Structures are given as C-alpha cells and as structure tokens.
Amino acid sequence: GSMRVCFRFASDQTRPQFEDPKWANYTTIKASNDAVLEYHYDPKGNVRPWDRTLYVKVVKGFLREGDTITITFGETGHGSPGMRLQTFLEDTFEFHTLVDPIATYNYQPLPLQPSIRIVAGPPVDYVAVLPTLRTAGQLFALRIKGEDGWGNPSDQCDLTLSLKANLDIVGLPETITLKPGIDSVTIEGLMVKELG
C-alpha cells in the first residue's frame, strides 16, 4: 500500500528534502515496525487544490493495525534549521492525507485529517492604518497593529506606544497599549477640524 500527504497549491511553503540532514526542509519518514519505505515529493502528484504531494509507499514488509508511519517535516536533530510552512495565518492548516491500504491505487481520505494552526510570530514592525481620504469634520478610525516578519498581524505585542500627529486630531489619545492575545487596537470616532 501507499499514502499521500498533500498540500494546497496556493501556498508559499518550502518543499521537503530527504538527502541532507543539515539543510533546511530535511524530512524523515519511518515505519514503527521497520517496514522499508520508498518516498518522494511531487509538486503535481495529486488533484488540485491538493496537488503538492509527499508520496510514501511500503516496498518491503507490511503494516498491521496499530503500526504507524511517522513523518517529521523539518527534522532538526542533525543540524537542519527546520522547514518553513506557509507564511500566512490559518486556523486549520491541513496535512491532507490519502491512503491506498490494499495497493489498488484507489486513494481514500482519512476520516480525520491531521491539521495544525499557523500563528503569527513576534512583532518586528508596527503599522498605523487610516483611511486614505477624509474631509474636515468627518469621523474616522485608526487601527494600530504589530506585524511579524511576514506581515501577519501579531498577537504577541506587549508595549505602549506614544501617538503624535502633524495636526490636531479630536479624540486621539496620547498613548495606546497593545497587549498579548490581541492583534490590533482600533480607535474610533476620530476627527480633524481642518484640512491638512
């Protein structure tokens, strides 16, 4: 039998490699009962949208109920820095897994798909988001957020920022605090009395 672990084509994750344990993206695949496995990565190995495919086949031995195949993406035990998954946030990043248990090439999805949550890293930059155009007397909002190295809103901010504008803004506080667990703060009801 064999299996496929598939990823969506609309992703910027790196591709696994199996040759050099010191390089990025080093991936290991092992059977719990020491069955011999053959594997490779094929960016077009399955039907879209799940076309980026890691293919694993049992070529010597077999698996019984309870035996497992363990795949470690970005194995760091021998010096690899790991593997970069996609750089954008997702609550359920799926390792879409299909199995062909009796070697008929009729792949079936697992009833429960393995998934992880892709979260933002620590902030490396802070961004203020405002409307492009507003007239004097028209209300607007200001949103302030920390962004990680990939531009994702980070919920790991923990600081107080001083706010200063080049003209008088009604309702603008002197400071704003970004706390852990919150990815942005919005200040509503702001207004300028004159054009600037």
Positions of predicted regions on the chain:
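Ser/Thr/Pro/Gly-rich, low-complexity intrinsically disordered stalk/linker tracts of secreted
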Residues: G1-A141, G149-G151
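Low-complexity "stalk/linker" and mucin-like segments enriched in Ser/Thr/Pro/Ala/Gly
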Residues: D34-H40, K44-N46, K164-V185
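Surface-exposed loops/turns
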Residues: E65, A136, D155-Q156, P180, ...
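Exposed aromatic-hydrophobic patches
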Residues: T70-T72, S184-L190
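Short flexible loop/turn segments that cap and initiate beta-strands
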Residues: F88-F93, L139-A141, K145-T175
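Short Trp-Ser/Thr-centered turn/loop motifs at beta-strand boundaries
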Residues: Y107-P114, S154, P173, S184-I187
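Alpha-helix capping and helix-loop boundary segments enriched in small/acidic/polar residues
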Residues: P131-T135, T175-K179, M191-V192
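Short, intrinsically disordered, charge-balanced linker/junction segments flanking boundaries
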Residues: A165, L190-G196
